[in-house]
Structures are given as C-alpha cells and as structure tokens.
Curated annotation (Swiss-Prot):
Its EC number is 2.9.1.3. CDD domains: RHOD_YbbB. Involved in the post-transcriptional modification of the uridine at the wobble position (U34) of tRNA(Lys), tRNA(Glu) and tRNA(Gln). Catalyzes the conversion of 2-thiouridine (S2U-RNA) to 2-selenouridine (Se2U-RNA). Acts in a two-step process involving geranylation of 2-thiouridine (S2U) to S-geranyl-2-thiouridine (geS2U) and subsequent selenation of the latter derivative to 2-selenouridine (Se2U) in the tRNA chain. It catalyses: 5-methylaminomethyl-2-thiouridine(34) in tRNA + selenophosphate + (2E)-geranyl diphosphate + H2O + H(+) = 5-methylaminomethyl-2-selenouridine(34) in tRNA + (2E)-thiogeraniol + phosphate + diphosphate; 5-methylaminomethyl-2-thiouridine(34) in tRNA + (2E)-geranyl diphosphate = 5-methylaminomethyl-S-(2E)-geranyl-thiouridine(34) in tRNA + diphosphate; 5-methylaminomethyl-S-(2E)-geranyl-thiouridine(34) in tRNA + selenophosphate + H(+) = 5-methylaminomethyl-2-(Se-phospho)selenouridine(34) in tRNA + (2E)-thiogeraniol; 5-methylaminomethyl-2-(Se-phospho)selenouridine(34) in tRNA + H2O = 5-methylaminomethyl-2-selenouridine(34) in tRNA + phosphate. Belongs to the SelU family. This is tRNA 2-selenouridine synthase. GO terms for molecular function: transferase activity, transferring alkyl or aryl (other than methyl) groups; tRNA 2-selenouridine synthase activity. InterPro entries: P-loop_NTPase, Rhodanese-like_dom, Rhodanese-like_dom_sf, SelU. It is an enzyme of class 2 (transferase). The active site is at residue 98. The gene is selU. Residues 15-138 form the Rhodanese domain. Monomer. It comes from Nitrosomonas eutropha (strain DSM 101675 / C91 / Nm57).
Length: 388
C-alpha cells in the first residue's frame, strides 16, 4: 500500500488526530524543540550529524551522503531500522520527519519500504510544520473569541475553568507551561522548551477551533511569562483585548484555596496524613520517611521562592514572612501540624500578590463584563451560554 506524503494542507488533520511521529533528526536538534506526538529515533546521532555537516560544507552533497551511508551500515543500520519498525508496529499510523523533509527522512522512508513498511513523511519537514503551527496561533488570535478569567491570587480561577469544561471550550495555559504562573508555581515536571510550549499551544488551538468553531474559549488571565516560557505576542495581545470576567473572593477564602493547593495537596499534607495514621509495619514507616523528606524539600523550595522575591517584599516583610515559614516548618516537623502555614500564606498574599495584581489591573484599566464570586461567575457563564 502506498502512503502519500503529508503536505501543508494535511497538517491540521495530522495534529488534531494526535498522529504518532518519528523525528529522525539528531538528539541535539530534538531537545531544542519538536512536533507534538514525536519520539526521537535519529538516523544520525549528534557526532555523525556533525561529521556529515562538515563534509557537506567542504566537499558537497554527494560526499556527505556517501559518508552517511558508510557510517550507518551493517549492524548500525539494522539497529536503527529495528527501532523504527518496533515503534511503527505499536503505532501503525506513524509519520516521519526530519528538518526540511530532505535526505534523512527520505532515506529512513526508503529503508522502511525495503523492509516492507511504507510510511509517509512530512513534506518540508519540521521547518514547514513549525511555521504552520506559528501561523495557527496568529490566525486563531485574529479570528477566535476569548473569555478571560481574572482575579487575585487564590480566588479559584483554575478551579472555575475546570468546572465549566462541560459548558465551554477551555484552554489551560498553566498546564501547557507546567507552571502555576507565580513565584511559587513550579510543578514537579520540568517546563517545556519555549518552542515545545508554542507547538503544544498551537495544537490545542487547532483542536479547539475544530471542535468549537463559534464558541468563545475560556482562558485564565496570565502575564506574558509563565515560569520560563512566554505567550506568543499575537495571542497575548488578543488576551489583553478580550472580555474579562473578574472572580472576587474574600481573603480568608483565598488563603484556604492556596493552603489546599500548596500544602494539603502536596507532600506536606500527604506526609501529615501518613504520620497521623501510623502503623507498626516497616513499609508504612518507610513511606512516611519518603513523604517527610519530600515535604521538607518542598519547604526548602518555598523558602527559595521567597528569597527570589525578597527585594520586592522589602527587608522587614521578607524577614517576617520567612520566620513564619520557618515556624510552619518546625510545627510540621515537631508536632505534625500544618495549619500554621496559613500565617505566611496570608501575609504573602497581602504583602506581595495583591499589590502586584491590583497594580497590573490599574495599568490595564480593566473593565470586566462580570465581577463576583467563583460560583457567581460560574452561574453567569452558564446563563450566558444558554442565551447565546
């Protein structure tokens, strides 16, 4: 069976179907950025690619291709071919790509065909697909409506977005960035590269556009940077000019929300629960020890995050919040108590996050289409959907 290659008109279908991809570029190229759904099974490793590149510059294309065939022959060729075959056996819809759709993916395609497996490649390769994804973000920003959920830290914006998934298409930028968007917002998984973040964003927008052509997409208000990654200019500017829904909750509710997310639902809360349910089994003791170690590492991480914003807090307030954090750590270690974390959380909100947020809103001169509690905002959104 002949599988025609994939041109630019077919990239939407390729990405929205979560098509498995084999990226045959060298690992150094792959880690800088890849297409969503890719696995890196290179035809040339980093050293081999460098040698072929040097030969190409000095002696031309024919000599470079000849050197590549000399290096990747015999057992080396069989090993790489077997990796591709094993992956395709598990993922029969696999598509191939290299940087420009040139020799590397073409040779891979031919070797597979010689082995009885016919798979298409992306015409124009990674470069063509990457430009398509960049254009996708720009086109979405020009043509599709957003509803932006804003509100001070701890007001439950992320929870609101999760709760209205059945009514609206939603885009979770923090999940794509693997970061909660604050000084304390790093997640356990490392953040993607900037290119990978943009590519994932584009694929999510493609899926939203395909499934919800006319519905506004609900997104949480973010600054341009979320951890180390940042939103493309066109999309960020579109967010800033979109309708705003302002979620407003009292301070104690917000502190409780933050406490739940950053203490109870983390190794700190898990370790407290494990120590409370002490059992005489050695395995239980080992689990408690592991959780306690993770909890202490998290306290250290919070202390480092606090240090990073010390200048913005000011010396006196930094020392005050730092001491409250240390007291909470001691209470956890000595008394298995975690409620005291609310003290430093509450001060951090009042001293740092609220002034930062309100200052941003004043500069932007935000005029929300709705302002109210999280539940009131949910009710408003559902009513708006019914009357659309």
């Amino acid at each position: 069976m002949n599988n025609p290659n994939i041109d630019s008109d077919e990239l939407t279908a390729l990405f929205t179907a979560d098509t498995p991809l084999i990226d045959v570029r060298a690992p150094l190229e792959f880690i800088l950025g890849s297409l969503p759904g890719s696995v890196n099974l290179p035809i040339l490793n980093n050293e081999e690619r460098a040698l072929v590149g040097t030969t190409y510059k000095q002696q031309g294309s024919e000599a470079a291709v000849m050197l590549g065939h000399e290096m990747i022959s015999g057992q080396a060729k069989q090993d790489r071919l077997q990796q591709w075959l094993d992956f395709i056996r598990q993922h029969p819809r696999t598509v191939l790509y290299c940087f420009r759709g040139g020799k590397r993916s073409q040779i891979t395609q031919q070797w597979l065909k010689d082995a009885g497996v016919d798979r298409p490649l992306i015409i124009g390769g990674y470069k063509q697909a990457r430009q398509f994804l960049i254009n996708t973000i720009d086109r979405f920003s020009e043509n599709h409506t957003l509803l932006v959920i804003t509100g001070p830290t701890g007001s439950g914006k992320t929870q609101l977005i999760q709760e209205i998934r059945n009514s609206y298409p939603v885009l979770d930028i923090e999940a794509l960035a693997r970061h909660r968007g604050s000084a304390f917002g790093g997640m356990s998984l490392p953040q993607p590269t900037q290119i990978d973040f943009e590519n994932q964003l584009a694929v999510n927008l493609l899926k939203l556009k395909q499934n919800y052509l006319f519905d506004p997409v609900v997104v949480e208000d973010e600054s341009r940077h979320t951890g180390r990654v940042y939103l493309p200019a066109s999309f960020f500017e579109h967010m800033r000019s979109s309708e705003i829904i302002w979620v407003d909750e009292p301070l104690n509710t917000r502190v409780d929300n933050i406490f739940g997310d950053y203490i109870v639902a983390t190794p700190i809360g898990q370790a407290q629960q494990a120590r409370r349910n002490t059992q005489p089994l050695s395995s239980a003791t080992e689990i408690q020890e592991i959780l306690c170690q993770q909890a202490l590492l998290l306290f250290d991480k919070y202390a480092s995050a606090l240090q990073a914003i010390s200048k913005k807090l000011g010396g006196v307030r930094f020392q005050e919040v730092s001491q409250d954090l240390e007291n909470a750590r001691s209470s956890f270690v000595n008394r298995n108590e975690i409620q005291s974390n609310k003290t430093w959380i509450e001060k951090l909100v009042r001293y740092y996050y609220d002034p930062l947020y309100l200052g941003s809103l004043q500069r932007r001169q935000v005029n929300p289409c709705f302002k109210g509690s999280r539940q009131a905002a949910i009710d408003y959104l559902r009513a708006r959907k019914q009357h659309a």
